[in-house]
């Protein structure tokens, strides 16, 4: 060997790391790296080798890049080459940051092609994921065309290798598979300084350690290595780097009284060391007192600490063993159970499958979902109720269907009874419970006596027939000997066909002043009724004006023979047809429709239509 070669070996600088969210700590990492580079310039080393994790992130900020280039330019100014490999923290898919610096003439990326420094060749292997280590290809390593006499070979890696802790690659295996003998392996990724001999040839393997503390557990001094190669062999020496102080304080609480005084007393014992330090306070002892961590941290900051961290070890000490145990469930089983609990329909299951499928890329989720749902819709017959998901409604109470109520004290809600007047209340929509018992639903009514029309004892009532969305009031003639409920039941069970009224054209009744038009004549079963198209705007007792109007109406309609409907032309009937409006009563209480049956269409069990979701 013609002359002695000195190479500075460093690694794990983690530039750009804002430790504890502190801008000062970010600057500390750059200062440590700057110290290393300045030492290389001052010692006039032959080269600087960086063994990975130059940056803490694969996406450093522009400010981080500019500061790094300014520091590396110091080496370029004195013709000291900077060699590096890619670590796991900064690794990108294609072009690496080292490639950018190489284009700028600030660095050179190591690989299977050697870099020559004097009579020393340097190779590099970028960080390899653990899963790809068994597949690593050792072929392709080249030797210089003409090897210098007594040429030394160095290999740079960013990997934790055996026999070091947490190793995932056998260092001896690497040495055996290389096509040449290596004099030393310069390593990165392990933040602690280490130096041992490995393999049958007893090759040196060394970690330089990180240049700054990345965690509180890294309590040893930070350093870098100087590799000296000469005719006498290879020598590895360590140089430490001055870094910010990490101060650890322990406070033990004895008894329940004055815990803060005991803690502050322990802190005050280190007042000279606290300024500009990163301070960690561990609290132990009696756990009965409750402490405010923020108050303690503020006290440390008031004493000059750069960063203050408080750890309460008492919590861990008081936890019972069974509480401290952690159990993990199968994630696939948990997801399947949650999907089952959600009761998704076919469309929901399709969307869930697409979103969680690893075979569908994110950019194609919307397109794939739309296509699958369209195919599902094409296979569905929306007129066939079989594709619906039926949820049985709650059983109907007998009191909901046959108990008459007073129009004053017990107003009828449109959600409480069946609209026998509406076409929606046909036999096709009767509750299955009623069909099974061979009974027809009997509507709840509100009724009040109007007058006796003839000596035969027929009395006319105004019956409020409560439907799904509207309320009608209709005069119904019954005999005195029959109760209103029996009359309504008889009328409802009669044939559906309505007998035609004789050709009598009664004069239309005079309009009533405080009345509101809400509907047209309708039929209630076979009981031919005249449904008054006018009802009072407000509930309550009938006024004399209303009684006179009703009496006059009945006298006019009494000319009809038997039970008949109000006669008129088709045009007049069509003109009177309009959607009835529900006249709510002040005392009416809302009732959930899902709690009752026998209400027209709502008598069918509640259904969820897939079309509603699509």
Curated annotation (Swiss-Prot):
Basic and acidic residues bias spans: 487-502, 535-558, 568-591
Region (Disordered): 393-434, 487-614
Keywords annotated in UniProt: DNA damage, DNA repair, Endonuclease, Exonuclease, Hydrolase, Manganese, Metal-binding, Nuclease
A Gene Ontology biological process term: DNA repair
Cofactors required: Mn(2+)
EC number(s) per entry: 3.1.-.-
Function field: Part of the Rad50/Mre11 complex, which is involved in the early steps of DNA double-strand break (DSB) repair. The complex may facilitate opening of the processed DNA ends to aid in the recruitment of HerA and NurA. Mre11 binds to DSB ends and has both double-stranded 3'-5' exonuclease activity and single-stranded endonuclease activity.
Family indicated by similarity: Belongs to the MRE11/RAD32 family.
Record-given protein name: DNA double-strand break repair protein Mre11
Species, as recorded: Methanosarcina acetivorans (strain ATCC 35395 / DSM 2834 / JCM 12185 / C2A)
């Amino acid at each position: 060997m013609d002359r002695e070669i000195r190479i500075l070996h460093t690694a794990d600088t983690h530039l750009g790391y804002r430790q504890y969210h502190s801008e000062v700590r970010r600057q500390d990492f750059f200062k440590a790296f700057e110290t290393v580079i300045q030492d290389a310039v001052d010692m006039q080393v032959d080269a600087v080798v960086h063994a990975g994790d130059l940056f803490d992130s694969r996406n450093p900020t522009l400010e981080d890049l500019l500061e790094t280039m300014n520091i590396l330019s110091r080496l370029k100014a004195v013709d000291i080459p900077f060699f590096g490999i890619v670590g796991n923290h900064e690794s990108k898919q294609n072009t690496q940051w080292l490639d950018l610096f190489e284009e700028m003439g600030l660095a050179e990326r190591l690989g299977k092609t050697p870099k020559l420094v004097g009579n020393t060749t340097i190779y590099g292997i970028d960080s390899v994921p653990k899963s790809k280590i068994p597949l690593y290809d050792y072929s392709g390593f080249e030797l210089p065309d003409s090897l210098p006499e007594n040429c030394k070979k160095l290999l740079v890696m960013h990997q934790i290798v055996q026999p070091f802790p947490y190793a995932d690659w056998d260092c001896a295996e690497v040495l055996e598979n290389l096509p040449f003998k290596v004099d030393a392996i310069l390593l990165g990724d392990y933040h602690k300084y280490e130096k041992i001999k490995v393999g049958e040839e007893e090759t040196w393997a060394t970690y330089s350690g990180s240049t700054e503390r990345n965690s509180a557990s890294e309590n040893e001094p930070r350093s870098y290595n100087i590799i000296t190669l000469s005719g006498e062999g290879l020598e590895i020496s360590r140089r430490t780097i001055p870094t910010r102080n990490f101060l650890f304080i322990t406070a033990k609480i004895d008894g329940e009284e004055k815990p803060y005084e005991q803690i502050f007393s322990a802190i005050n014992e280190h007042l000279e060391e606290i300024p500009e330090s990163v301070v960690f306070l561990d609290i132990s002892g009696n756990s009965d007192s409750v402490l405010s961590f923020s108050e303690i941290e503020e006290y440390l900051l008031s004493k000059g600490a750069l960063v203050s961290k408080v750890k309460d070890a008492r919590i861990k000490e008081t936890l019972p063993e069974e509480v401290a145990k952690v159990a993990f469930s199968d994630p696939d089983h948990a997801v399947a159970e949650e999907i089952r609990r959600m009761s998704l329909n076919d469309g929901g299951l399709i969307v869930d499958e697409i979103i969680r499928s690893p075979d569908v890329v994110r950019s194609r989720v919307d397109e794939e979902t739309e296509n699958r749902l369209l195919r599902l819709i094409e296979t569905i017959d929306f007129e066939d109720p079989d594709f619906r998901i039926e949820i049985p409604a709650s059983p109907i109470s007998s009191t909901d269907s046959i108990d008459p109520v007073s129009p004053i004290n017990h107003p009828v809600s449109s959600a409480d009874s069946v609209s026998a007047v509406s076409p929606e209340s046909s036999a096709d929509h009767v509750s299955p419970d009623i069909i099974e018992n061979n009974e027809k639903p009997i509507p709840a009514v509100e009724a009040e006596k109007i007058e006796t029309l003839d000596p035969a004892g027929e009395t006319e009532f105004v019956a409020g027939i409560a439907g799904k969305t509207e309320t009608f009031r209709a005069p119904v003639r019954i005999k005195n000997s029959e109760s209103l409920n029996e009359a309504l039941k008889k009328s409802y069970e009669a044939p559906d066909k309505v007998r035609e009224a004789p050709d009598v054209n009664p004069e239309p009744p005079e309009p009533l002043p405080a009345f509101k038009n809400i509907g047209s004549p309708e039929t209630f079963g076979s009981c031919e009724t005249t449904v008054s198209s006018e009802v009072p705007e407000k509930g309550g007792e009938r006024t004399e004006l209303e009684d006179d109007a009703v009496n006059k109406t009945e006298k006019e309609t009494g000319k009809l023979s038997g039970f008949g409907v109000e006669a008129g032309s088709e045009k007049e009937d069509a003109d009177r047809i309009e959607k009835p409006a529900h006249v709510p009563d002040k005392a009416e209480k809302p009732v959930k429709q899902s709690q009752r049956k026998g209400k027209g269409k709502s008598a069918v069990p509640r259904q969820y239509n897939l079309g509603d979701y699509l």
